[in-house]
Amino acid sequence: MLFRSGLAHEIGRRFEPDELLPEAAQGALALQVRAGEEYLAAAADDGETRERVEAERTVVAAVGGGCLAPVAAHHDGSTLVGLVAAEDGSWLERRSGDDPEALGRELAEVAAAHAE
């Protein structure tokens, strides 16, 4: 967005996902259209981005996370990475895998083990 707005010079530092994992679907746009006018949104659909976003959201949902939970996921096209952490920052677990549901379950198990 900053690049398209001509504000790229305002970027002080760009974080890579291995430094700071973003929330699922960060940067993706969603379109809502009236029933019967789905063709309008279809023109803007990028299948690869949609698949990545769906994988990221599946990880977060399997963990049981939401907008306020310390859960993140990122798919760069080749690697799916998920993260779960304690709300107080006392622990953090980052894992990667190919199956979004399995990765989410793994992270949910980690969170449950820390909750005991």
Where would I find each of the regions flagged by the language model?
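Small-molecule-sensing regulatory modules
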Residues: M1-E116
